[in-house]
Regions:
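Intrinsically disordered, low-complexity proline/glycine-rich segments
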Residues: 11-183
Length: 183
């Protein structure tokens, strides 16, 4: 699986900005910053253990507003992810590229009713066409996670473009620090 396939599909026939070379790794570790009083912050590490990205989610926003930077000093913003809706049930998250003047590069839309039982998200290109899917690994496990053993059964999601697998998100079992492996 190679995450760059998704990045290339989103940018469809456009030249990839040089700054996106950080997206060329096969695996990442996403670790939530603990003891953050307001909002959420995540460090995203490359396979060598270096910070590849830093993400910050603003606190007290009615509409989601997530920023992805090259590092913790937040000097270069790579992506912005925002939603127009207040409720998260079937929200569409718009992904924009600030390096290219805020151009809209694609979206992620949660399938609201389906996600009650098993989380499902759709990848959309800039034109709003469905190009891929992220889906929780199993409906049976998803139900157990939601109603009984959520803390014992880490979530796992598989992402595809068409029928081609491009990514896998797996939450690592750790009751103290949230860690997700992205392959």
């Amino acid at each position: 699986l190679h995450w760059s396939i998704f990045v290339e599909a989103v940018y469809m026939n456009s030249e990839l900005p040089p700054v996106l070379s950080q997206f060329q790794h096969n695996t990442y570790l996403i670790r939530q910053k603990i003891f953050k009083l307001f909002g959420a912050a995540f460090h995203i590490y490359d396979p060598a253990g270096n910070v590849a990205f830093y993400s910050k989610q603003k606190a007290f926003k009615l509409k989601e507003d997530i920023r992805i930077y090259t590092n913790e000093d937040m000097s270069m913003e790579l992506l912005t992810i925002r939603t127009e809706s207040i409720l998260d049930f079937g929200a569409t998250y718009h992904v924009n590229d600030p390096q290219q003047g805020g151009v809209h590069i694609g979206s992620l839309r949660r399938k609201g009713l389906k996600s009650i039982i098993r989380d499902e998200w759709v990848f959309l290109n800039a034109a709003g066409q469905e190009i891929g899917l992220i889906q929780e690994d199993s409906a049976a496990l998803a139900l157990l996670r939601r109603f009984y053993l959520g803390w014992l059964l880490p979530q796992q999601y598989d992402g595809t473009l068409g029928n081609v697998p491009v990514c896998n998100f797996k939450r690592n079992f750790n009751p103290f620090v949230s860690k997700v492996t992205l392959d």
